[in-house]
Amino acid sequence: MGNVILVCGLNGAGKSTMAKALAERINCRFIDIENIYFSRQDNPDYPYEKSRPYEEVVSLLTNIVNGENDFVLASVTGRFGDEFISHLTCVISIEVPKDIRLKRVYDRSYIIFGEKSCKGGDYYEQVKSFHDFCASRDENLVNDWLSTICCPIIKVDGTLPICDNVNLIAKML
């Protein structure tokens, strides 16, 4: 078993971007939990339409953990069972003010779905529902979860340039 690094933070913190850059820097696989949670086959135009059951996600992730040497996972938290947590080498927690995170979520929705995400668009209701969910999320969700694990935790400021944070993290690993 190699290194399993989790990059976590609330929606819009920059988890996927940071995790992908870190994985490239340390030369290992990048995995985004969204690719495990959501089956992109059902509706490729709106891949977030149908999520897998939590138990299936845990099973898929456990198979990955048991089969991979090194990888960096992007996820809000690492609540995927004790086996997953036992494999964590390090957790990177990205902290970003709520207003910035929500703007990033909104901007990302528009980049991905364009006018379909706007009022009257095909995905407006789904996108609005997701935005409302992000806005209502408990700001302590990640830190509360972090307090339950026993592995090195590196906290970074997600408003800083990705390259600066990746350099800092790489030095600390």
What residues fall within each predicted segment?
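Conserved substrate/cofactor phosphate-moiety recognition/catalytic segment
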Residues: 20, 24-62
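Hydrophobic anchor at the beta1->P-loop junction of P-loop NTPases
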Residues: 7
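Small-molecule kinase domains that catalyze NTP-dependent phosphoryl transfer to phosphate-bearing small molecules
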Residues: 114-165
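Walker A/P-loop
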Residues: 16
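ATP-binding Walker
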Residues: 13
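Conserved phosphate-donor/acceptor-positioning beta-strand/loop module used by diverse small-molecule
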Residues: 87-108
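Pre-Walker A (Motif I) flank of P-loop NTPase domains
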Residues: 1-4, 69
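P-loop (Walker A) phosphate-binding loop of NTP-binding proteins
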Residues: 10
